[in-house]
């Protein structure tokens, strides 16, 4: 077991202690209000409480989509730490691929699930957990087959969640806003298509002094630029034909 201690530098005292599991897949994620999310094997825990109970082949709270599109983790606390967004990846339909562990005294085979080209890929959902009610909901994204849900971010008021959806052909990106309480799609703020590819790598970032404006990063003209958008203004789809890909 690991020990977690929260220290108040102003008061010069420890204000909290927790026992944490010693697991290679722990992926500890701390919220600003001291809430803690982590994974044990394929399930997600918050403050020591198991919040998912999935069988082998379904993984919660870990990175998905083979770490493409800037994805490097599977949990996302809201700005005040009151809600937790997380990935749920069903890879039970994906064939297993053997890897040899040469660090063992005698070599051992460890199987991973890896979709070969042209074969069935995993399916991803985005969940939201509320620690105060101990309830999970999942975004109503429709059938997740052949879709990438990337670059998750929160609205400053924690009432909505933003993500960038990419199709399997990776030439169409959509910036979507979902209701954090119901999981319903509120609006698609922006779309970008390209004949070659789009590659969103960064979530949107809201301006600290204006909750209605955010920065969106894109290579839509062939170069990486920052764009200022307004959540209250209709943004029409963009189609680009530059030599390089977009987003």
Q: For the regions a protein language model found, what residue spans apply to each?
A:
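Short loop/turn segments that connect beta-strands within beta-propeller blades
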Residues: 8-12, 130-134, 180-183, 231-234
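Short, small-residue-biased leader/transition segments that mark boundaries at the very start
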Residues: 1-2
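Beta-propeller fold detector
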Residues: 15-19, 48-56, 137-140, 186-191, ...
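Predominantly five- to eight-bladed beta-propeller fold
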Residues: 51-75, 86-138
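Short glycine-/Asp-/Thr-/Trp-enriched loop segments that recur within the blades
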Residues: 57-71, 143-149, 194-202, 244-247
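Blade-terminus and WD-like Trp-Asp/Gly-His loop motifs, strongest in beta-propeller folds
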Residues: 27-35, 39, 74-83, 151-160, ...
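A conserved hydrophobic secondary-structure block that centers on an alpha-helix together
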Residues: 8-58
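Short glycine/acidic-enriched loop and turn motifs that connect beta-strands
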Residues: 43, 91-94, 167-171, 220-223
């Amino acid at each position: 077991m690991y020990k977690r201690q929260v220290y108040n530098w102003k008061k010069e005292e420890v204000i909290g202690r927790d026992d944490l599991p010693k697991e290679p897949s722990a992926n500890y994620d701390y919220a600003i209000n001291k809430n803690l999310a982590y994974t044990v094997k394929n399930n997600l825990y918050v403050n020591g409480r198991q919040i998912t109970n999935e069988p082998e082949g379904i993984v919660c709270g870990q990175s998905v989509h083979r770490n493409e599109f800037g994805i490097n983790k599977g949990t996302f606390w809201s700005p005040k730490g009151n809600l937790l967004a997380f990935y749920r990846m069903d890879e039970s339909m994906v064939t297993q691929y053997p890897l040899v562990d040469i660090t063992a005294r005698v070599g051992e085979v460890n199987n991973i699930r890896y979709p070969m080209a042209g074969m069935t890929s995993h399916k991803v959902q985005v969940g939201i957990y509320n620690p105060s009610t101990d309830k999970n909901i999942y975004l109503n994204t429709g059938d997740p087959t052949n879709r990438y849900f990337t670059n998750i971010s929160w609205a400053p008021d924690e009432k909505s969640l933003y993500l960038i959806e990419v199709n399997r052909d990776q030439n169409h990106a959509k910036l979507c806003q979902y209701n954090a309480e119901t999981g319903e799609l509120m609006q698609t703020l922006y779309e970008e298509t390209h004949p070659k590819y789009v590659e969103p790598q960064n979530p949107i970032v809201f301006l600290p002094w204006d909750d209605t404006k955010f920065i969106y990063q894109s290579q839509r003209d062939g170069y990486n630029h920052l764009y200022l958008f307004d959540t209250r203004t209709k943004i029409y789809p963009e189609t680009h034909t530059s030599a390089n890909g977009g987003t």
